[in-house]
From Swiss-Prot:
Residues 749-758 have a biased composition (Polar residues). This is Mechanosensitive cation channel TMEM63B. Palmitoylation is required for localization to the plasma membrane and stability. The gene is Tmem63b. One of its GO terms (cellular component) is early endosome membrane. The modification Phosphoserine is found at residues 111, 113-115. It comes from Mus musculus (Mouse). Expressed in cochlear hair cells (at protein level). Highly expressed in the subfornical organ of the brain. Expressed in small intestine.
Amino acid sequence: MLPFLLATLGTAALNSSNPKDYCYSARIRSTVLQGLPFGGVPTVLALDFMCFLALLFLFSILRKVAWDYGRLALVTDADRLRRQERERVEQEYVASAMHGDSHDRYERLTSVSSSVDFDQRDNGFCSWLTAIFRIKDDEIRDKCGGDAVHYLSFQRHIIGLLVVVGVLSVGIVLPVNFSGDLLENNAYSFGRTTIANLKSGNNLLWLHTSFAFLYLLLTVYSMRRHTSKMRYKEDDLVKRTLFINGISKYAESEKIKKHFEEAYPNCTVLEARPCYNVARLMFLDAERKKAERGKLYFTNLQSKENVPAMINPKPCGHLCCCVVRGCEQVEAIEYYTKLEQRLKEDYRREKEKVNEKPLGMAFVTFHNETITAIILKDFNVCKCQGCTCRGEPRASSCSEALHISNWTVTYAPDPQNIYWEHLSIRGFIWWLRCLVINVVLFILLFFLTTPAIIITTMDKFNVTKPVEYLNNPIITQFFPTLLLWCFSALLPTIVYYSAFFEAHWTRSGENRTTMHKCYTFLIFMVLLLPSLGLSSLDLFFRWLFDKKFLAEAAIRFECVFLPDNGAFFVNYVIASAFIGNAMDLLRIPGLLMYMIRLCLARSAAERRNVKRHQAYEFQFGAAYAWMMCVFTVVMTYSITCPIIVPFGLMYMLLKHLVDRYNLYYAYLPAKLDKKIHSGAVNQVVAAPILCLFWLLFFSTMRTGFLAPTSMFTFVVLVITIVICLCHVCFGHFKYLSAHNYKIEHTETDAVSSRSNGRPPTAGAVPKSAKYIAQVLQDSEGDGDGDGAPGSSGDEPPSSSSQDEELLMPPDGLTDTDFQSCEDSLIENEIHQ
């Protein structure tokens, strides 16, 4: 089909007239630049740079005076545990800020590190700019986790790749394009920098094809170099734990242990943890702690001021300026006391019933990795017998009761990677939920894919008629590219929430889904549809399945190579580099959510709780997708419009600096698996493949499909696609792959199953590293559950999101003391 289409394109293109009017008629006149000096790039560059400076100035002001946003967040339990060793040498700093040892539960996540030198290095108005360059990878790994280091290393390799591509494109390809004389001989003509300036029979077109293939090789080499340095560490606990689905719902942990120890000689099961439906229990636990905190806050306030506080318990009640029926004020302590008692009772009843809600899943931890791998292989090996393809696991006296023939066995994810509240959503319900969400998402983006359709709708009401003939670069190029950036910035947020409501079992799965969906929609929105002169997916499919598809295909693909078309994407990359990265620094979506939550808070206690709990995990999926979208645009046009590469390099440099700041100062650490990083590598390889596609279409339309340059590009493209498909689907061509990971394990003697001379019993595992929901760990620690070795109620709970957990202050630190600590910290930093 592809050769037939290309041959038709070549024949039609050779006979077609100038497609300029056709392409421009498909767009609105204000979205594509027509005949402006150098495509309006200097004007857009100046405007975006001024906006960038203004946003940086605004950020510096907000950073100095508005510390409530992103300032007083609690760190996760994992972060606290990683810092315990360092805290011994930081007692002087912590004592001055948090009254001695009281820092165990409370640490500031943003802006100023718990390290003394970092507290001193970014106190000034703009000193945070230099602090970004002083942050070392070891400090980022310790503060943000290994995934943040892999992400930043990925960016550095992309920057190195763009440096090489930029030198080749600007130093060689750009002068070659200038040497043509097909377009007007005007120094201000943007078209002279593009491949459209070369005649169809020019032998210099071989240079473009060769460079496209070279860029592909450079991309693969760069990614192999990146992945070879990714010493991805997997915890010993993860490699020794299996996740089993399909167990009998009423199977006991002792029977699971007995099955494995009978079926596999020399097998020791350290722990077998059945899974329960804890979604409602986790919700009640979080609400109960919020109520306790609210009562404590107003109790301390009343003891201090001797005046009972009154609140409006309705959402946004503190914003009401008049008292209406149903919104009367109530006494705060009485309200929170009743609420706490009700939630405690609901929590107690739910906790008693949780053992009656098994999910038919279990996490089983063995004594070493070898036996774990053997068991996994037994349950996943394929032995074809007739029409069935099923492994034959070893049997035991408990096999029939446990329904081992229905088991699905995989390696367990990291405990911090699991959404425990989502495990109850599975099977048909999960697939139906996922289908409905994605259908709604597709319908939404089907019609609202690009900003062109919005402006086209405005044209129907003659809104844009007065500016139609201005031919001003601000009107024709700055606002359309800014609007395109706004839509592309909104898309990851929409896709993220769609992935969130899909209720994935792991954070890695949620991030991978977000990354792939975002990247696909962004490529359509930002690259494919604007290049083809289409305004939405609606028009794309109508054109694709129209009877006149082949007749109009050549003209549509001619739209890609119009002289002024590249200017639109150059200006988009400029907008992403300056305005996009500045907005990432300001974190406007998070700020808006923070303001909404403050408005919905019912009292001062809840507003203070919001201020402490507004930090979230860094969304690697959305960040990878957006960054790879811009990189794909740059690589796709790196040969047809080489002037885009320096601006792409500028985008990546600013993006790297902004992400270093945000990862270290603004977001919670996230624990993911390596699949999210390998998925990003696959998206990188897609960029030079699209560049080959662009050159193939250009060569086919200019010289025909049978021309040597067209055939060479086609053969290279087919071979590349075949190798990629064989590697992704069947695991072949590993030495030609962009992946070259090296897996390392944490230093634990897995074979002897001993750690520091002692066997790794369940009691030796930290609470945050146990395969049990945190709310059940707390129950065991309180003595309300069956108990577990090593569990202690004195250990603070951990959480992955600060909205899930509200930690109580440690012994010896009252709520009033903590409030005074907050106030003194903020006041001290504002006046520095």
